[in-house]
Amino acid sequence: MRFRSSSHSLKHVDRELKELINSSENANKCGECGNFYPTWCSVNLGVFLCGRCASVHRKVFGSRDDDAFSNVKSLSMDRWTREDIDELVSLGGNKGNARFWNPKNVPFPFDGDDDKAIVEHYIRDKYILGKFRYDEIKPEDFGSRMDDFDGESDRFDERNRSRSRSRSHSFYKGGHNRSDYGGSRDSFQSSGSRYSRQLAELKDMGFGDTNKNLDALSSAHGNINRAIDYLEKSSSSRNSVSAAATTSTPPLPRRRATTSGPQPAIFDGTNVITPDFTSNSASFVQAKPAVFDGTLQQYYDPATGMIYVDQQQYAMAMQQQQQQQQQLAVAQAQAQAQAQAQAQVQAQAQAQAQAQAQAQQIQMQQLQMQQQQQAPLSFQQMSQGGNLPQGYFYTQ
């Protein structure tokens, strides 16, 4: 049995995986919570994951015995194959996952960083209960369990892998094998009659190759939206492959000979110039200090196949994030203090208004009492002087 385990193919797979992470569809983010620098990926669901969301995927899907599963793989520790990359591309990455599993655009819970149980409910509602979709979840939406490899054994031994892949891989590669249509012309014709309406719609949309359209519909199980994604990804992939074939790649610099084999290329923050480099270079240009622009760079060692992260840049990124959180906390505290001050001013104004109203009421009462006391006195004075008003008379 022949295995695709040469260093040349692994280099291409790792490079394509790195480019896929930083593409516009994924933006180097976790497809669930949106955190930067994902370190895991669910291959069959087509979504990159951070460490927290990857552990939630294992917890939610690990104890199930039905058709729902998540094939979670590490980006640096597990071994990736061409089929894994093709499946991720065909599913559309984080954006494709959101379109298929969350068309209602339900946001990730804000309290997910504090309570992991909320994240579990979110993942369960999204993939198990299908609350974020308009249609029901089907078993074929999760793909085939034959693609779900054990991550630990996959890091060291590729012989346990199944060579049977989904038809989305065969379509993405551009090959149209007769076995993809059931192995006979009758099966091909039955699929064409079953998807006749979808084929007509694809043809009206400009996809004129009937064989490719039928292959895409068979891979998508009749879902026309996924079939369109397959067709678009296939076209863009062939264009990128042809463009890459026409451009030549510059050779890598030579490594110094070592007796103990290749070592991990970990950046320690120093600028070291080897003697081989100085002897082979006609002119030496003084290196300038690196300026941190806020983005975290990942480094790939082709000898070991491992991906490293500059610890100094990682610390600076974490420091910037902490400063932003502190500034946000200070702004919230200031806003709260201003709100309290305004509330106190309003309370004082209301108290003053009530006091003024009470004072006016007391003055009105005193004025009424004075008027009542003055009325009998004026009547008595008029009677003593003999000048009574018309209609009044003396009685004895």
Swiss-Prot record:
Domain UBA: residue ranges: 193-234
TM spans (from-to): none
Biased composition (Low complexity): 234-249
One of the record's GO cellular component terms: actin cortical patch
Residue ranges with Basic and acidic residues bias: 148-161
Annotated localization: Nucleus
Modified sites of kind Phosphoserine: 153, 184, 187, 240
Organism: Saccharomyces cerevisiae (strain ATCC 204508 / S288c) (Baker's yeast)
Zinc finger (C4-type): 30-53
GO biological process: endocytosis; negative regulation of phosphatidylinositol biosynthetic process; positive regulation of transcription by RNA polymerase II; regulation of transcription by RNA polymerase II
Record keywords, A-Z: Metal-binding, Nucleus, Phosphoprotein, Transcription, Transcription regulation, Zinc, Zinc-finger
Broad class of where this protein is predominantly found: nucleus
Gene this protein is translated from: GTS1
Function, as annotated: Appears to modulate the timing of budding to obtain an appropriate cell size independent of the DNA replication cycle. Transcription factor involved in both heat resistance and flocculation.
Protein name (database record): Protein GTS1
Leftover remarks: Present with 937 molecules/cell in log phase SD medium.
One GO MF term: GTPase activator activity
Ranges where the record places region Disordered: 148-194, 233-266
Key word Zinc present: yes
Modified residues (Phosphotyrosine): 181
